[in-house]
């Protein structure tokens, strides 16, 4: 086996990337998330492929084709709910992965970090387009509201929206192109993941201390392959519990009603993994301002390496920065909660405060705290 893995040219690339890759000996379970994301992506592509064989991207039949998958296709309901809840697992892993990068200073690998941000945008776009495909009420109105935000762009906005819609409203053309892009994007994401890993393997992995560990390295296989299997078992257990016990827990009941352009649902909201960004969007009364804030809520990750003022890379020995990090996590959870609430008196104010907090923690408080910690440590 050893000889075969080393000799064939293609096998050699795979062996170098996944088996013999030297990894730091101190990496905790927070470093499992990368492989879990890879598994989530594979699972989504496989279940999505099987679903696409039975789905029709036509406004007249889309809703019925999804019903047909759940009722008539062998284990179609398992495929459908694994795909829908697999997206939730994907985003849980994604947000934890980004959080790990923030906490341990992995953003100092700027190429890997920037490709990661592009990947995050690509996955979010894919998930949004996938949500439109069942053509339920929330699919239709979610697509209408979110694509309509582009009309806030000065001068070209209206033309741009009509170009994306393929008409004067979300209709057959929109659904067909969303299906085409939803099918295509995961393969583009897979290619970008390879580039992400390529840049990561140029520098080697970070570790919890944030100190270079070139002196103490171990092979990826068998140590981290075995360690990753634990995370895999946990995520599969979570996913299967969701799929088999409460498959609709994270979905919206409105999506069980066929799309009706004449009847607007009382509360239009996206899936739970977009609620924090949706809350930031809604907290600004101006349309263009809201769109800018929405994009910046993710794009702000790109300037985090520039805001790193600490002499230490990781937060593991910086208690004040740790407090701010967990405050940021609590703030994001608050935003997620607010995004799912109606636009009423207490929620509007809480959402605005949480949005201000989100940006001020990242842009102002974290860099200042890092400088203060440097001073306290006499550096």
UniProtKB/Swiss-Prot annotation:
Which residues participate in heme b b562 binding?
83, 182
**Which CDD domains does this UniProt record tie to the protein?**
cytochrome_b_C, Cytochrome_b_N
The protein's required cofactors: heme b
> Entry's PANTHER family?
CYTOCHROME B
Q: Which InterPro entries match?
A: Cyt_b/b6_C, Cyt_b/b6_C_sf, Cyt_b/b6_N, Cytb/b6-like_sf, Cytochrome_b, Cytochrome_b_C_euk/bac, Cytochrome_b_N_euk/bac, Di-haem_cyt_TM
Quaternary assembly: The cytochrome bc1 complex contains 11 subunits: 3 respiratory subunits (MT-CYB, CYC1 and UQCRFS1), 2 core proteins (UQCRC1 and UQCRC2) and 6 low-molecular weight proteins (UQCRH/QCR6, UQCRB/QCR7, UQCRQ/QCR8, UQCR10/QCR9, UQCR11/QCR10 and a cleavage product of UQCRFS1). This cytochrome bc1 complex then forms a dimer.
Record: residues binding heme b b566: 97, 196
Topology in the lipid bilayer is annotated as:
Multi-pass membrane protein
Q: Where is the protein situated, by its record's location annotation? A: Mitochondrion inner membrane
Q: Additional info?
A: Heme 1 (or BL or b562) is low-potential and absorbs at about 562 nm, and heme 2 (or BH or b566) is high-potential and absorbs at about 566 nm.
Which named protein is this? Cytochrome b
GO CC term, one of those recorded: respiratory chain complex III
The portions of this protein that span the membrane are: 33-53, 77-98, 113-133, 178-198, 226-246, 288-308, 320-340, 347-367
Give any single GO term for biological process.
mitochondrial electron transport, ubiquinol to cytochrome c
Gene3D superfamilies given in the database record = Cytochrome Bc1 Complex, Chain C
Q: What is its main location?
A: mitochondrion
**Which one Pfam family would you cite for this protein?**
Cytochrome_B
For this protein's source organism, the top of the classification is: Eukaryota, Metazoa, Chordata, Craniata, Vertebrata
Give residues annotated as binding a ubiquinone: 201
């Amino acid at each position: 086996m050893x000889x075969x893995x080393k000799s064939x040219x293609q096998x050699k690339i795979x062996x170098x990337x996944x088996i013999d890759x030297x990894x730091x000996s101190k990496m905790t379970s927070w470093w499992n998330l990368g492989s879990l994301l890879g598994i989530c992506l594979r699972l989504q592509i496989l279940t999505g492929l099987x679903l696409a064989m039975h789905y029709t991207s036509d406004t007249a039949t889309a809703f019925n084709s999804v019903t047909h998958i759940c009722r008539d296709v062998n284990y179609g309901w398992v495929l459908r709910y694994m795909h829908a809840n697999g997206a939730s697992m994907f985003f849980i892993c994604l947000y934890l992965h980004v959080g790990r990068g923030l906490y341990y200073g992995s953003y100092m690998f700027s190429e890997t970090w920037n490709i990661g941000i592009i990947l995050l945008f690509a996955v979010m776009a894919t998930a949004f387009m996938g949500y439109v495909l069942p053509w339920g009420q929330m699919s239709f109105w979610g697509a209408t509201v979110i694509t309509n935000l582009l009309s806030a762009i000065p001068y070209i906005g209206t033309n741009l929206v009509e170009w994306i819609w393929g008409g004067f409203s979300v209709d057959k053309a929109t659904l067909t192109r969303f299906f085409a892009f939803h099918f295509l994007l995961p393969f583009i994401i897979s290619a970008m993941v390879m580039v992400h890993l390529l840049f990561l393997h140029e520098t080697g992995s970070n570790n919890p201390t944030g100190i270079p560990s070139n002196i103490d390295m171990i092979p990826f296989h068998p140590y981290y392959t075995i360690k990753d299997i634990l995370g895999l078992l946990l995520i599969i257990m979570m996913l299967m519990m969701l799929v088999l016990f409460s498959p609709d827990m994270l979905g919206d009941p409105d999506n069980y009603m066929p799309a009706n352009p004449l009847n607007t649902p009382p509360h239009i909201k996206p899936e739970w993994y977009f609620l924090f960004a949706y809350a930031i969007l809604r907290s600004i009364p101006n349309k263009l301002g809201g769109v800018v804030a929405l994009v910046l809520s993710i794009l702000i990750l790109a300037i985090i390496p520039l805001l790193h003022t600490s002499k230490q890379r990781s937060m593991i020995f910086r208690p004040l920065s740790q407090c701010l990090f967990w405050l940021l996590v609590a703030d994001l959870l608050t935003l997620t909660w607010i995004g799912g609430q109606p636009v009423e008196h207490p929620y509007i104010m809480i959402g605005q405060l949480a949005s201000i907090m989100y940006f001020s923690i990242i842009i102002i408080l974290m860099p200042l705290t890092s400088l203060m910690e440097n001073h306290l440590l006499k550096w």
